[in-house]
Amino acid sequence: MNLILMGLPGAGKGTQAEKIIEKYGIPHISTGDMFRAAMKNETELGLKAKSYMDAGELVPDEVTIGIVRDRLSQDDCQNGFLLDGFPRTVAQAEALEDILASLDKKLDYVINIDVPEQLLMDRLTGRRVSPTSGRTYHVIFNPPKVEGICDVDGSELIQRDDDKPETVKKRLEVNQKQAQPLIDFYSEKGYLQNINGDQDISRVFEDINELLKGLSS
C-alpha cells in the first residue's frame, strides 16, 4: 500500500503514522528523515541538500525530488510506504506521480486527518512547561495535579511563545494555505480520503484501518 498522510499541526498525524506502520509493516518516510539519511550517507543529493541548508536556503525541488526518488527505490518500499511531509506543493505532487510511474507503482490513498480549527487551537495552545524541570503538561489532556504548578519541582508553569494563540493561529493559517491546493489536487484525482480527527485516537485509527484493510493482502 502506497500512502500519503496529511494533517495540520495538532491533528495527531504522528500518532496515527506510528499505528499504521506498526500494523502494516511499511516504512514511515518523512522529509526530515530522508534528508538526514542522505546527508549522513553523503550521497550526491545529500551533499547538495546540505550545502543549501548550511547556507540557510531552501532546498530546490529537483534535489528534494531526487532524494524522494532514491528513497522510494529502496527495497523496504517494495510492499508500500507511508509518505509524511512530501509532497508540499502541487508541483511536487506531479513529480511524485512521475516517480511512482517510473517505479511501476501507483498511489493508493492520500489520508487527510481533518480536525476543526478550534479544536486544533485548543490542542496546540494548551501546552504548559516547567521552566526549571522542562516537564511538559497539557491543560486538557495531561494537566498537573495542581493547576499551573509543576508536579516535580513546584515551579510555576509557563506557556511558550510558540504555543500562544496568536502564534498558533498564524501557523495554522500558513499550513492550511499550503495544504489546500494539495487537498484539491488529490481530491480531483480521486485519492483523497478525509478522516475525522475529532474523536479518540483509537477511533481515528479504526477509521483508517477500515479504509486500508481492503489494500492489505
Swiss-Prot record:
Residues noted as binding ATP in the record, renumbered to the chain: 10-15, 127, 136-137, 199
Organism: Halalkalibacterium halodurans (strain ATCC BAA-125 / DSM 18197 / FERM 7344 / JCM 9153 / C-125)
NCBIfam families attached to this UniProt entry: adk (TIGR01351), PRK00279.1-1 (NF001379), PRK00279.1-2 (NF001380), PRK00279.1-3 (NF001381), PRK14527.1 (NF011100)
ATP-binding found in the keyword field: yes
Compartment(s): Cytoplasm
Gene (UniProt): adk
Keyword Oxidoreductase annotated: no
Pfam families per record: ADK, ADK_lid
Protein name (Swiss-Prot/TrEMBL): Adenylate kinase
Keywords: ATP-binding, Cytoplasm, Kinase, Nucleotide biosynthesis, Nucleotide-binding, Transferase
Function: Catalyzes the reversible transfer of the terminal phosphate group between ATP and AMP. Plays an important role in cellular energy homeostasis and in adenine nucleotide metabolism.
GO cellular component terms, A-Z: cytoplasm
UniProt family annotation: Belongs to the adenylate kinase family.
Positions that bind AMP: 31, 36, 57-59, 85-88, 92, 160, 171
Gene3D superfamilies: P-loop containing nucleotide triphosphate hydrolases
Region spans: LID: 126-163
Signal peptide: none
